Amino acid sequence: MAGWSCLVTGAGGFLGQRIVHLLAEEKELQEIRALDKAFRPELLEEFSKLQSKTKLTMVEGDILDEQCLKRACQGTSVVIHTASVIDVMNVIHRETIMNVNLKGTQLLLEACAQASVPIFIYTSTIEVAGPNSYRDIIQNAHEEEHLESTWSAPYPYSKKLAEKAVLAANGWALKNGGTLHTCALRPMYIYGEGSIFLYNYIYKALRNNGILTHHSKFSIVNPVYVGNVAWAHILALRALQDPKKAPSVQGQFYYISDDTPHQSYDDLNYNLSKEWGFSLDSRMSLPISLEYWLAFLLEIVSFLLSPIYKYQPPFNRHMVTLSNSIFTFSYKKAQRDLGYKPLFSWEEAKQKTTEWIGSLVKQHKETLKTKTH
C-alpha cells in the first residue's frame, strides 16, 4: 500500500506509544496520527524525535467526540484502536467504562465507514475469554475453543461487546464503495517498563520495606511483554494490507502471548524485581475459597451502603478469580496467519523491565533523601 497513513488511538498509553515507535520504522508510511486525551510533555518530546522518520501528527481529543474522530479518520488508511479504560477493581463508574470502551469503539467504526478507512485493528484483552472460575484449568488454549467471559464487571463486559462490534463490522461497505476489514488482538496480561500496575505494585512494596504482597501465588498465567504486543499489531496491519494473507485474517481474533515462562503473577513480580532486593511476603495467605467468599461479602456491604456511602472493597470476586486461575494461551494462530513471533525474548524483556524497576527504586531513594534534609 503505497503512501499510506495510520491513526493510533490511545497513542500516549503504555502500549500505544510502543506501536507509534514501531510504525515510524514502516516503509512507505507517510503519516502517523496519534490520538489521545492528553500527552505528557516528556512523551511529546520523545515523539518529536520520530518526525525525522515520518510525519507525526498529534491529535488531542476524546474518543466520544464524533467530530474529532471524523477529522482524525479523514484520509487515513489504517486505524489501530488501543484507547481504553482499564479497571479491574470497579473504581471507575460503570457508565464511563461502557461509554469509552464500547460506545467509543462503535463511534470510531462509524467514523471509519464514513471516511472510507479500509483497515481496523482492535486491541482487545484476554479478559474477554475469562477466567470465569478459579476452579477451571485452562492451559495452552486456542481460538477454536471459543472461550467467553461471563462476568458482568464493566471492564471485561465492555471489551467483550466492543470486540464483537469490531469483528461484526468486518465486510462493512465504505462510503467510497470499498470494504472495511477488521481483526482483534487479545493480549495476555501485559508487563514491561511503564506498566501502571507494576509501577503501583513496586511503590507499594517500597513503602513496605521491599516486601512484595501476596495476591496470586496459586495462578499460572503467561504474561506478555509490551514490545511483543506492539509488534503483533504491526504484523496484523501488514497481514491485512497483503492480498494473500488478508482473507484468512479478516474478521478474526488472535491470542497474543510470547515466550515469557508460565508462572504466577507473584512470581513474575518477584522475578522482575528481585535484583533490587525485593522479596515475597513469607506470611500465609488466605485459602482462595475463603478469599472469594470474603470478596462476595464485601461486595454485598458495598451494595447495601451505596445509597448513603461509597465503600470501595479492597478486592472483589472478579479480581480474586483473575489473580488465582490457571489460564494460559498459545500464540500459534497468530504465528500461522500473521507471521508472529516475539520480537523480544524473555531474557531481553526481563532485563528491560528490571532496569526500569531499578530506576523507580533510585527515584524513591532520592525522594526519601529530599524529605530527610
Swiss-Prot record:
UniProt keywords, alphabetically: Endoplasmic reticulum, Isomerase, Membrane, Mitochondrion, Multifunctional enzyme, NAD, Oxidoreductase, Steroidogenesis, Transmembrane, Transmembrane helix
Annotated TM spans: 288-308
Pfam family for this entry, one: 3Beta_HSD
Recorded GO MF terms: 3-beta-hydroxy-Delta5-steroid dehydrogenase (NAD+) activity; oxidoreductase activity, acting on the CH-OH group of donors, NAD or NADP as acceptor; steroid Delta-isomerase activity
InterPro entries: 3Beta_OHSteriod_DH/Estase (IPR002225), Lipid_A_modif_metabolic_enz (IPR050177), NAD(P)-bd_dom_sf (IPR036291)
Pathway annotation: Lipid metabolism; steroid biosynthesis
Subcellular location: Endoplasmic reticulum membrane; Mitochondrion membrane
GO cellular component, one term: endoplasmic reticulum membrane
Protein's GO biological process: C21-steroid hormone metabolic process; steroid biosynthetic process
Residues at the catalytic site: 155 (proton acceptor)
Record field: catalytic activity: a 3beta-hydroxy-Delta(5)-steroid + NAD(+) = a 3-oxo-Delta(5)-steroid + NADH + H(+); a 3-oxo-Delta(5)-steroid = a 3-oxo-Delta(4)-steroid
EC number of this enzyme: 1.1.1.145, 5.3.3.1
Gene3D superfamilies referenced in this protein's UniProt entry, alphabetically: NAD(P)-binding Rossmann-like Domain
Binding site for NAD(+): 159
Membrane topology summary: Single-pass membrane protein
Function: 3-beta-HSD is a bifunctional enzyme, that catalyzes the oxidative conversion of Delta(5)-ene-3-beta-hydroxy steroid, and the oxidative conversion of ketosteroids. The 3-beta-HSD enzymatic system plays a crucial role in the biosynthesis of all classes of hormonal steroids.
Family classification: Belongs to the 3-beta-HSD family.
Protein name: 3 beta-hydroxysteroid dehydrogenase/Delta 5-->4-isomerase
Source species taxonomy: Eukaryota, Metazoa, Chordata, Craniata, Vertebrata
Gene (UniProt): HSD3B
